[in-house]
Amino acid sequence: MVKLRLKRCGRKQRAVYRIVVIDVRSRREGRDLRKVGFYDPINNQTYLNVPAILYFLEKGAQPTATVHDILKKAGVFTELTLNQTKFT
């Protein structure tokens, strides 16, 4: 199974996180499949590659709780539901 997870980067006492797509069996700092975003909790900055995130969510990737909150705040799930509705 594949998850959207935070990967810690940065210095001591100055954590920054990358939002990555990674196999669930890999460790936190393990090799990721793709980098899809960036989150800085100190400066409250977020960068998301929304098309890549939507692609992996449609394929069945599960976000962790923290990543889910970040994506919800950015409005990614509203775009996901718009993509999934079919016009007849």
Swiss-Prot record:
Pfam families: Ribosomal_S16 (PF00886). InterPro entries: Ribosomal_bS16, Ribosomal_bS16_CS, Ribosomal_bS16_dom_sf. GO terms for molecular function: structural constituent of ribosome. The keyword Chloroplast applies. PROSITE patterns: RIBOSOMAL_S16. It comes from the Eukaryota. SUPFAM superfamilies: Ribosomal protein S16. It is found in: Plastid, Chloroplast. GO terms for biological process: mitochondrial translation. GO terms for cellular component: chloroplast; mitochondrion; small ribosomal subunit. The keyword rRNA processing does not apply. Its main location: plastid. Belongs to the bacterial ribosomal protein bS16 family. This is Small ribosomal subunit protein bS16c.
